[in-house]
């Protein structure tokens, strides 16, 4: 009898433990998101952080945004000679580490998630661990992107490998769970010696990007035919190839080109467009709030970028019902989104891109069909809701195996 009672007691205890574990797995988390620029949707990393924050809150979690421009936990900007000037042209700022703000923001948090490996992020992880709070990190800054912004330095042998090593040394070696937005960048981390637990989770797209109404079968190709591209106006985004391709198109006079973004090459790209393009064009910054309507008004999305960890702009375009035409590059993950070969062209090849553009202009029924296919595929595979649920699962795993050891 005693043995039976003891056995029943153990089973009861295990049942209670299982119930407690289940309750913990369903309970809302308090997550501190540490991103240098927390109040700016002009660059991809900040945009991703703000989208995740909104969806985390919608799913019932408590989010504390910590960074420049945060309404609740703001920090000062850190000025780095020359580097800050270049970064500002790409809507980026560096945050000043602030232990007092960190401690206030992290008090009572379940986990801290850091976006970038600079001094600000390193200080946040150090503070979290001192407070006994687990920290995770995202790998959102591709070393190849840094090198393209550094001019001739990108031609130095081994420069990219050095940056992968440096980022690991500065931050990621103190992290057990890393969020990578694509399999491509996860493979790069493995190739460069990262041994942490890698979680491949898309940045997702916001639900306000909804599909446009596709044209009825038999409708002629629209005039003007509006082509849109979105991204930093920097050399690695290679908008120059897009401008040359539009100039080579058989339908150049009927094309209206919109390149949405800001960056160091804005003046140069505008000068090139003025010289080469017979049709209308616009190159410059567009407020993020305007992008859903703008994308739905366009006919084709071109993404000529050579370097991308994922490319949120392609996701948003596909979700809006646009067919993408994407550069194939070993340093870009964006090609993973292509559902047909006619959505790909060889990077830096304006002739091939012009051929792709002409084919889609001359096949309006296929353009409408594939636009609807891309929109539905994106809704099923890359919704912010499903991506954030995977992110929360990663955070719960990090919390469960945290032992306080750096």
Q: In which residue ranges do the predicted regions lie?
A:
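Conserved donor-binding/catalytic core segment of Leloir-type glycosyltransferases
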Residues: 211, 218-247, 258
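Nucleotide-activated donor-binding/catalytic signature segment of Leloir-type glycosyltransferases, i.e.
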Residues: 267-289
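Aromatic "clamp/platform" in nucleotide-sugar-dependent glycosyltransferases that forms part
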Residues: 117, 306
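Carbohydrate-associated surface elements
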Residues: 184, 204
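Conserved acidic donor-binding segment of nucleotide-sugar-dependent glycosyltransferases
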Residues: 339-351, 359-364
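Short hydrophobic beta-strand element within catalytic cores of glycosyltransferases
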Residues: 323-327
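Short alpha-helical donor nucleotide-sugar binding micro-motif in glycosyltransferases
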Residues: 106, 285-286, 293-298
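Membrane-proximal helix-turn-helix segments that form the acceptor-binding/catalytic region
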Residues: 130, 142, 158-177, 192
């Amino acid at each position: 009898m005693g043995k039976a009672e003891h056995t029943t007691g153990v089973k009861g205890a295990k049942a209670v433990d299982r119930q407690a574990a289940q309750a913990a797995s369903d309970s809302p988390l308090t997550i501190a998101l540490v991103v240098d620029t927390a109040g700016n949707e002009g660059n991809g990393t900040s945009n991703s952080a703000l989208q995740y924050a909104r969806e985390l809150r919608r799913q019932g979690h408590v989010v504390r945004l910590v960074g420049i421009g945060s309404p609740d936990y703001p920090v000062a900007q850190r000025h780095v000679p020359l580097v800050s000037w270049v970064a500002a042209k790409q809507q980026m700022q560096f945050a000043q580490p602030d232990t007092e703000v960190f401690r206030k923001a992290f008090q009572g948090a379940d986990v801290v998630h850091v976006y970038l490996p600079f001094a600000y992020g390193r200080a946040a992880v150090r503070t979290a661990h001192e407070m006994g709070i687990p920290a995770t990190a995202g790998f959102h800054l591709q070393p190849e992107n840094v090198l393209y912004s550094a001019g001739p330095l990108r031609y130095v042998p081994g420069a990219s490998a050095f940056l992968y090593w440096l980022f690991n040394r500065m931050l990621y070696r103190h992290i057990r769970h890393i969020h990578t937005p694509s399999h491509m960048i996860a493979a790069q981390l493995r190739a460069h010696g990262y041994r942490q637990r890698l979680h491949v989770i898309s940045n997702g797209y916001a639900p306000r990007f909804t599909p446009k109404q596709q044209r009825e079968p038999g409708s002629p190709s629209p005039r003007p035919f509006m082509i849109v591209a979105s991204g930093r106006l920097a050399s690695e985004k290679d908008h120059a190839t897009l401008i040359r391709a539009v100039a080579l198109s058989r339908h150049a006079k009927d094309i209206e080109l919109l390149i949405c973004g800001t960056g160091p090459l804005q003046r140069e790209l505008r000068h090139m467009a003025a010289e080469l393009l017979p049709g209308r064009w616009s190159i410059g910054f567009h407020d993020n709030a305007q992008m859903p309507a703008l994308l739905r008004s366009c006919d084709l999305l071109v993404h000529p970028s050579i370097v991308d960890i994922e490319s949120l702009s392609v996701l948003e375009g596909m979700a809006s019902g646009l067919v993408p035409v994407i550069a194939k590059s070993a340093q870009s993950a964006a090609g993973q989104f292509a559902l047909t070969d006619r959505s790909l062209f060889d990077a830096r090849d304006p002739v091939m891109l012009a051929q792709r553009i002409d084919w889609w202009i001359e096949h309006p029924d296929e353009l409408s069909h594939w636009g609807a296919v891309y929109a539905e595929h994106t809704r099923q595979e890359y919704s912010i809701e499903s991506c954030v649920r995977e992110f929360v699962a990663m955070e719960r795993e990090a919390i469960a195996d945290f032992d306080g050891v750096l």
